[in-house]
């Protein structure tokens, strides 16, 4: 497959918390869709190694969630640091989307971008400056047509690839039921 500037890059990170000055990325996943939200390829899902000291800083919610999903064990066993995960992700993306063409796509994606800017700046720079944030449509639906929200339920596994697939499906749902193209 050759890189196509109309393809969309979807990304999700799992982190030890929400503050990029204190917390770290522990999982990254990407996938690529065409402009019509058909999934073309799933990139690597990478647990990013962090020290025991860093993991010990997680709050109760993060400990419970990431231990329960098995992510903490995968992080401890991982040989990928931030840079290796960043480079592996970029190598995958180069096959599908030229640099600087796709907005960063996902749910509440501004939070992920803050972590990319700090810990994976080359990957952050691979994206266009624009955002395609599914949570924007969710917030608009909540205010303008709240009954729409009941039609889509997320599993909320807080595993990066699952979360991305849900974001794509959620946007497709809003396209059909809210935007009505």
UniProtKB/Swiss-Prot annotation:
Full protein name: Oligoribonuclease
Any GO CC annotation of this UniProt entry: cytoplasm
Keyword Nucleotide-binding among UniProt keywords: no
NCBIfam families found in the cross-reference section: PRK05359.1 (NF003765)
GO biological process, any: DNA metabolic process
Location relative to the cell: Cytoplasm
Entry-linked SMART domains: EXOIII
Lineage: superkingdom: Bacteria
Annotated source species: Citrobacter koseri (strain ATCC BAA-895 / CDC 4225-83 / SGSC4696)
GO molecular function: 3'-5'-RNA exonuclease activity; nucleic acid binding
């Amino acid at each position: 497959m050759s890189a196509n500037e109309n393809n969309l890059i979807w990304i999700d990170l799992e982190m030890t918390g929400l503050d990029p000055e204190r917390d770290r990325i522990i999982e990254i996943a990407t996938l690529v869709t065409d402009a019509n939200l058909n999934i073309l390829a799933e990139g690597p899902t990478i647990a990013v190694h962090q020290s025991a000291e860093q993991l010990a800083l997680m709050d109760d919610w993060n400990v419970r969630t990431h231990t329960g999903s098995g992510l903490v064990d995968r992080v401890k066993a991982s040989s990928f640091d931030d840079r290796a995960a960043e480079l592996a992700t970029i190598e995958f993306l180069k096959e599908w989307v030229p640099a600087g063409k796709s907005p960063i796509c996902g749910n509440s994606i501004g939070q992920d971008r803050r972590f990319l800017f700090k810990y994976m700046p080359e990957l952050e720079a691979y994206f266009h400056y624009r955002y395609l944030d599914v949570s924007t449509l969710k917030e608009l639906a909540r205010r303008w047509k709240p009954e729409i929200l009941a039609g889509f339920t997320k599993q909320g596994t807080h595993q990066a690839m699952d979360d991305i697939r849900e974001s794509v499906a959620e946007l497709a749902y809003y396209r059909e039921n809210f935007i009505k193209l």
